[in-house]
Amino acid sequence: LYSYVEHDCIIGDYVTFAPGVKCNGNIHIEDHVYIGTGAVIKQGTPEKPLVIGKGAIVGMGAVVTKSVAAGTTVVGNPARILEKK
């Protein structure tokens, strides 16, 4: 039950990774983000990294294919907005 973080990722302060998270390359995760068990964050590009905004929540098993705005909760495959603060 491990999580992994690939190349060129930037992770902010107070970020929580539950078990089994897969964080692929060129991703920027801002402060106070929670990423649920088994979530997959697809790879960004060096020119346009995938961004998980401040205070966002990624639900268990979600597959994130595009950036998530700050304060947003996303769930599902592919990840869709459940709630926006």
Question: Which functions belong to the PLM regions below?
Answer:
Residues 1-75, 80-82:
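Structural signal for interior beta-strand "rungs" in well-ordered beta-sheet cores
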